[in-house]
Amino acid sequence: YKRQEVESLAKNHWASFWEKCAAVDFSHCTDPRAPELERRVLLSQYLLAIQSAGSVPPQETGLTYNSWFGKFHLEMIWWHQAWQPLWGHANLLDRTLGWYETVEPVAREIARRQGFPGVRWMKMTDPSGTEAPSNVGSFLIWQQPHFIYLAELVYRANPSDEVIKKYNRLVQETAEFMYAFATYDEFHGRFILKGAIPAQETLRAATTINPPFELSYWHFAMQTAQKWRERAGEKRNLEWDEMIDKLSPLAYNEDHLYLASEDAVDTYKDIRFTSDHMAVLGSVGILPMNKLIRDDYMKNTLHWVWDNWNWGKTWGWDYPMTAMNATRLGEPEKAVGALLMDKRTNTYLQNGHNYQDGRLRCYLPGNGGLLTAVALMCAGWDGCQVKNPGFPQDGTWDVRWEGLKPMP
């Protein structure tokens, strides 16, 4: 291409991008933090459009420079790209999701080797789907339901037979593994999750039972997979229904605080359990409220995390995760406060990049999480009756928007 052609193509592309997408206007807000939030929102859209919208999932640092040996991490694709269908760019996520079909044989072999049906999506990988060796990554499971969630977001943006035909088979294969991975506890008459390292990676695979975020995600994704069966004209899987009905509720302590996992009885006494990701908050926020959770206990947990967490040992997406939890629990002051909390890993540089430390000078999951959180804070979720549920209703946050879609 000649320079003039490139300039013309770029001009037309960006005009189309901004005209198609949703928009959020903070100019009527009087809270002094609003301009900074608007800056982060606008720059994040641009940064993610150029670095997290390709034919393969993006690495944490996108195309800026290599991180983790240039590998991308499938548990991060939700953070990079879940915002896209919510902001009018389902086509960008759709483009990336096609990669899953190309690596299906690898994922099927991983599941087969471990004695499971269906497909087990890898954690740290590359365009070929090769599973990178790791004493942590191979035990993670929260990347598994992402495909179901992301396919659901694409469908909600374009509810059509075409989308069902395109993704239903892999939705079902993903759920087959999830059902088989859960263990039925005959003594207590319940299904449990074990043998995994949860999103909060300070826990150990050998001892962890029923991590809360993963339990909630299993519940949501299996319900969603059943919906896809019905949309495709298939009968519900009765075994899956039994698991959905009998999944273990989240474990809590005598103070009615949810534990990092059922076995982690010292969650609030041992800093190992109160560092890294506060994944328990993802159980409601990233995901809708469900029958495994009591909202009053989850509010207790949010308040404890807010006041006591080891915030110096967090990551960029922990702040939007906290904001989404606060939004769904009816605490908009905390939602805004989380997005703008003055912590090193919640720093957004002049260019919009989410700075973590000298090694990770940009961290795109933080940017993507920010946009997903703002969508939830504005457009809410299925059944939400509150306007702008994530912003205080005291008149200082007169947020106006168009084109955003609610979350599940």
Regions found by a protein language model. Name each.
Residues 122-133, 201-207:
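Aromatic- and acidic-residue-enriched carbohydrate-binding clefts of CAZyme catalytic domains
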Residues 70-109, 127-130, 136-161, 165-169, ...:
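Active-site core of glycosidic bond-cleaving carbohydrate-active enzymes
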Residues 2-71, 90, 100-108:
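Acidic/polar, glycine-enriched structural segments that form the non-catalytic walls/loops
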Residues 15-21, 50-61, 116-128, 142-149, ...:
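Active-site-adjacent bridging/hinge elements
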Residues 54-67, 108-115, 119-123, 180-198, ...:
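Glycine- and aromatic-rich loop/turn segments at beta-sheet edges
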Residues 388-408:
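Surface beta-strand/loop "capping" patches
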Residues 173, 177-228:
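Acidic/histidine-rich catalytic neighborhood
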Residues 25-34, 56-70, 80, 103-104, ...:
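Primarily short, surface-exposed interaction patches in extracytoplasmic proteins
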